[in-house]
């Protein structure tokens, strides 16, 4: 089995250099938020997993990149990680109206919440075009945000548009919206356009709605991934004293993973969202 607890400690202590590139706009990156659970798929079969090829928003993609590079260093490129977005959790700090709200959600919900950093309104078709998440599933995720009072909705002739609820949010300051999605997942969504053309243009017909952005702070993220062997069937090791710097052309560089005294780029994280090391399976 993969030694998640030891590896997560290495990730937490890693030095991340946010070099010039597509991740530069993210600013400070905190690896202490990351608690990935990596499972060897040869010993744990996951049933009923949706086969979704998700395009992650930039910040989530960056953190996945950090985890993958960490495992490449520790296991010397022995494994290939396949992320399962239906089985992870995240914690956001967001500003809704005059309230600072802590939102605990699953990764699919986190993907859409992250999109609201760039626009104040989304529809299922625009989510599909941005992320590749199927229309019906996108509608259910957006509906779960509506049920949690995070967004309002507006019906149009083409699609239902969901708008950040920055004026009339009356909910709690600490909410867990995972159950809203679970309850909606097996139920049909009452959509005004269930047969939308998924190849439609990415621009929403409601793009003229007055903008009011949702502001999210750092996220506390736990992803679930499974690993494929690249070659060989040797047992996994918990650490690698001779781990070398992984040199690649990607935009985030990791320093020495083994030295806990290395300086880290850490921003204020959500204290209510902090989690202990992932359980070792």
Curated annotation (Swiss-Prot):
GO molecular function, one term: ubiquitin protein ligase binding
Gene3D superfamilies to which the protein is assigned, alphabetical: Cullin, Chain C, Domain 2 (3.30.230.130)
Residue stretches of biased makeup (Basic and acidic residues): 200-211
Coiled-coil spans in chain: none
Region of interest (Disordered), ranges: 192-212, 227-281
Pfam families linked: Cullin (PF00888)
Record-linked SUPFAM superfamilies: Cullin homology domain
GO-annotated biological processes: ubiquitin-dependent protein catabolic process
Biased composition (Acidic residues): 227-240, 249-260
Family named by the database record: Belongs to the cullin family.
This protein's name: Uncharacterized cullin-like protein R337
Organism of origin: Acanthamoeba polyphaga mimivirus
């Amino acid at each position: 089995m993969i030694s998640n607890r030891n590896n997560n400690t290495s990730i937490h202590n890693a030095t991340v250099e946010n070099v010039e590139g597509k991740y530069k706009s993210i600013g400070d990156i905190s690896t202490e938020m990351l608690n990935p659970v990596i499972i060897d798929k040869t010993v744990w079969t996951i049933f009923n997993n949706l086969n979704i090829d998700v395009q992650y928003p930039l910040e989530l993609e960056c953190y996945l990149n950090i985890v993958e590079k960490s495992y490449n260093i520790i296991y010397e490129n022995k494994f290939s990680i396949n992320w399962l977005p239906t089985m992870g959790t995240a914690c956001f700090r967001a500003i809704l109206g005059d309230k600072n709200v802590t939102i605990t959600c699953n990764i699919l919900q986190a993907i859409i919440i992250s999109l609201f950093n760039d626009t104040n309104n989304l529809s299922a078709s625009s989510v599909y075009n941005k992320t590749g998440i199927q229309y019906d599933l996108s509608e259910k995720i957006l509906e779960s945000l509506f049920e949690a009072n995070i967004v309002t909705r507006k019906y149009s002739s083409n699609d239902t548009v969901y708008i950040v609820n920055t004026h009339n949010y009356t909910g709690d300051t600490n909410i867990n919206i995972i159950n809203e999605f679970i309850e909606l997942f097996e139920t049909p969504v009452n959509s005004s356009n269930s047969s939308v053309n998924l190849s439609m243009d990415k621009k929403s017909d409601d793009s003229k709605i007055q903008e009011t952005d949702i502001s999210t702070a750092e996220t506390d993220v736990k992803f679930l991934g499974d690993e494929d062997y690249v070659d060989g069937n040797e047992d996994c090791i918990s650490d690698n004293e001779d781990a070398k710097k992984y040199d690649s052309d990607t935009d985030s560089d990791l320093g020495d993973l083994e030295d806990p005294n290395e300086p880290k780029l850490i921003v204020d994280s959500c204290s209510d969202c902090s989690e202990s090391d992932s359980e070792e399976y």
